[in-house]
Amino acid sequence: MVGGGALRRVGKYEVGRTIGEGTFAKVKFAQNTESGESVAMKVVDRSSILKHKMADQIKREISIMKLVRHPNVVRLHEVLASRKKIFIILEFITGGELFDKIIRHGRLNEADARRYFQQLIDGVDFCHSKGVYHRDLKPENLLLDSQGNLKISDFGLSAWPAQGGALLRTTCGTPNYVAPEVLSHKGYDGALADTWSCGVILYVLLAGYLPFDEVDLTTLYGKIESAEYSFPAWFPNGAKSLIHRILDPNPDKRIRIEEIRNDEWFKKNYEPTREIESEEVNLDDVNAAFDDPEEDADHTLDDEAGPLTLNAFDLIILSQGLNLAALFDRRQDYDKLQNRFLSRKPAKVIMSSMEVVAQSMGYKTHIRNYKMRVEGLNANKTSHLAVMLEIFEVAPSIFMIELQRAAGDTSDYNKFINNYCSKLDDIIWNFPIEKSKSRISRLSKR
């Protein structure tokens, strides 16, 4: 069973709580009732695809991604549809974002950075060989599995329409990882644009911060277009040389992936990822989703009338290894709390307080049932930020509030969370730590 509250079903999948939300899709945790496998279900409005006349392109990219079988790319299992929704069933990754690892622990050592970069290049190169380009590569789109291996998410799906009518997410999101030819809105080679982003990611892994990072967009664009950046003193010389060749603002002179593979720094301790053996893949589900969707009574995902109730299984999934004490410990910073806190106030009081605080900070709020979307410009007034908040009941009269980034830069989001949560002392519950640990211990033994 996926969780408490009103259980919903899409085909053979039991659908649980929302685990992510973007500008055009929601991602929900789900479970295959036949195999017991946990999956991520991306729920997309068909109208957003039809509005931008991208059905053929999206169908093509989904078809290709279903054919892609690579250990460093999040796997697309199948596609389902109703008249109003398309449901994309994806591999469920438990290790979190690579960006969070950098936020918590700082820059990586050279060996770890090289290993992640090698896996990134393996996955990117394989998808390029299938004719699919990412266009929005950044650490937030790089996930880690339970073994610490890198998984690239949203490959093949990044050209989907975003809010505001832009066709490429790279042109409407944070530009720090984007190649100069993309920012100039000229035609560009998708493979070379992805290569540039890989170079920026390598810099971030080794330095712990961005090579291009300015308060105002005009200055930022100028530095990206001229490739104006510098290295910290500790930066490995071999990596410096490789990054210089990748971050060439002239795409005609920029190093290509096959040349990256031959670089001496890259080749050290390199073990090429073993590709998954080819298997017969049926595309009938993709064709049916776009060509002749049928309304199915099971294919309904309505918003809940009240807060969802989370059971023990949900809490274990949230805890990533039974480390539930973090939910109760206000002595940790909010990043390490995984952006969740508890409250004993009534759910309506919690929602009202969160709305008032968000509006006092200059953000707009949109409330539906026990979910709230907060959006506006970041602290520097340079880019859009959107945050989703949802209230869950974890025990009688005890509620958990979860915050998730819906749009905008992760660093801006982290700053918002720390500022926002510091203003919510009246509703955050300071639970006794030792008592929480004993209850968690009893829960885990059941």
Swiss-Prot record:
Keyword Nucleotide-binding: yes
Entry EC no(s): 2.7.11.1
Active site: D136
PROSITE patterns: NAF (PS50816), PROTEIN_KINASE_ATP (PS00107), PROTEIN_KINASE_DOM (PS50011), PROTEIN_KINASE_ST (PS00108)
Chain positions recorded as ATP binding sites: I19, G20, E21, G22, T23, F24, A25, K26, V27, K42
Domain NAF span(s) in chain numbering: 301-329
Cofactor(s) essential for the protein: Mn(2+)
GO BP annotation list: response to nitrate; root development; signal transduction
Induction entry: By salt stress.
Keyword terms of this UniProt record: ATP-binding, Kinase, Manganese, Nucleotide-binding, Serine/threonine-protein kinase, Transferase
Annotated region described as Activation loop, given as residue ranges: 154-181
Catalysed conversion reaction: L-seryl-[protein] + ATP = O-phospho-L-seryl-[protein] + ADP + H(+); L-threonyl-[protein] + ATP = O-phospho-L-threonyl-[protein] + ADP + H(+)
InterPro entries xrefs: Kinase-like_dom_sf, NAF/FISL_domain, NAF_dom, Prot_kinase_dom, Protein_kinase_ATP_BS, Ser/Thr_kinase_AS
Family, similarity comment: Belongs to the protein kinase superfamily. CAMK Ser/Thr protein kinase family. SNF1 subfamily.
Record's function text: CIPK serine-threonine protein kinases interact with CBL proteins. Binding of a CBL protein to the regulatory NAF domain of CIPK protein lead to the activation of the kinase in a calcium-dependent manner.
PANTHER family: CALCIUM/CALMODULIN-DEPENDENT PROTEIN KINASE KINASE-RELATED, NON-SPECIFIC SERINE_THREONINE PROTEIN KINASE
Domain notes: The activation loop within the kinase domain is the target of phosphorylation/activation by upstream protein kinases. The PPI motif mediates the interaction with the ABI (abscisic acid-insensitive) phosphatases.
The name this protein goes by in its record: CBL-interacting protein kinase 8
Organism: Oryza sativa subsp. japonica (Rice)
